[in-house]
Amino acid sequence: MSNKQERSYGQGAQGEPTISTPAKPSLGAKLRYSFDNSIAKSGMFVTWMFVLMVIFSILLVLIKSILFALPFITHPETAIEFNFETFWGSFATLFGKGGEATWAERILGFLTWACTVALGGSVTGFIVGAITRTFDRLRKGKSPIVDNNHTLILGWSNRIYPILKELAIANSNVRKARVVIFSNHTRDYMEDEIEARAKDLGKLKVVTRTGDVTNPEDLKRTNIANAKSIIVLDSDETGDANVVSTVLAIKAVNPNTNIKIVTEIDDANTGEALTTATNGQVITVRSHEIIARVTAQASRRPGLAAVVLDLLDFDGDEIYFTDVPALVGKTYADAILAFNEACVIGLLNADGTTSVNPAQDTVITPGTKIIAIAEDDDKVVYTGVREDIAKSKVTPLAKRDEVAEHLLIIGWSSMGRTVLNELAQFLPKGSTVHIVAQSRYVDPAELANLKFGEINVSYASVTGDIDDLISAAKDKNYDEIIVLGYRNAISESEADAQTMLTMLQMNQLFKADGNGVEPTRLVAEILDSRKSELARVAAVDDLVVSDSLAALLIAQISENPALAPVFEDLFDAEGATLNVRKISDYAPIGKSVSFAELVATARNHGESAIGYRLASGTGAEGSTGVVLNPAKTSEFIPVEGDSLVVIGNL
């Protein structure tokens, strides 16, 4: 996305805006809010104390100057004689006394001083204690939020770090961008974790508050009514029940249906019920299901995981909705070749429904918007239908005989069932899946009698020794190996460490001679995005980074709720889906071809091309080789291993 102007999603992507007049906080409330946020940081506390000392010093100097400027209260100078009385006067002054004429007055003065010190110390201690308790309360994040147009995140999970990074990119051109995080963790914990795991947030200001996300009284402190959008994170420990309770608490505090609520949900029925009960205000993201689908499809389509992450992040081309009157009366097939710097992927109909990769003969009617991938919304410029390209010769898709495939899955979690359900839809008849899982992490009973369509599933409980892997890997000539993390059985860091160890062991077996293990395509799931660079060292073919994938979806929908049905269609088991196909199915190898010609060929196959993946560009400094939305006029020479990224049917 271009950094030259504020972020936009095109002409009315979300329909006519509903304008509400937020209650403006008073000047006193703003000053208290700024003081609360600054005093919560130890460095700012020292700064405030220094400022107060300077102010008091200036006041004292002014008072002294005024007093000495008044002759009727200033004594004339007298000669100083050194004697006991002079000594006593100086000594007593140290205790705030002096000037007593008799010893009786002096003794009484010292007794008075002692009482004053005792009482003053008690009062001072009480005041210091009260101030300390006030600072502790501020540090605990109990003060209210007065920010407007902020993104409100309720709850806490590992997805919060990549979400913040994506929101920072999305709002890089937004003045005073704010994210408020409200969870049951302490303020110190949240700020320390964010500082350690989500650095370089640019101009994005993150405000943290502590409280119960399911308690309406606590939520009143978050200024929900003036939030731009709300994100409800699914804690792995509490699950959907906590998300439902949080949504109910939000509705109790703020019945305004104009603020979209993006939630993480595991159960599809729960998600559908929430969306229906709130008339579409709640948008559900079934993170685990989408991660499982991408993992399954990545095992079938090399490079798909990289394409998905490239499409979803804010640092590059994005999806926009644009009204193009010149296309009214023309077909979707015409629209695909009508934009030089944008890739059309679907239509937003006048009734609000979306159609991703509709039939090529679909007629564009008044009020219909184009859904396109572009660098920015001002790049979605109609350049006319390319009739010369549209009539180009069609390269027939190579028809491949369906041959039974054999997959090895190492590791297991509840997500494994969704992966196999997805694989069962397109694996040829007679295909097999062998599951190898460590018995200390997975109950063998959980793997018994698994049935997924016509796939033959077997399993083995192992100890994790490399001999177990050798035994499993040499059993058959596997077409794919999928490594799943032991999510929920152990911590994320332990699960990722186990996954990376398995990847290293498998690559060692691939390189060794005489062990009966043939080199095989390796797809792995990493739970923590911080481990992705380490995981790539293991030479994995495709890496599915779970928390990044989920976070990207949540951040995208939070910034633009109109994208929700588009992503739902792309990642649903039915309908259009992302595919990475051999480029030889669309153009001859070794001959220069323009991207417009590839788009035309894909169009004639009922697909919408959005980019390509160069085999020569993968692996170098973490590069994925993915090129999304190249100019239609750009040309390159395809080689073996290159792929075309299209949206079509399985």
What residues fall within each predicted segment?
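Cytosolic regulatory regions of ion transport systems
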Residues: 1-650
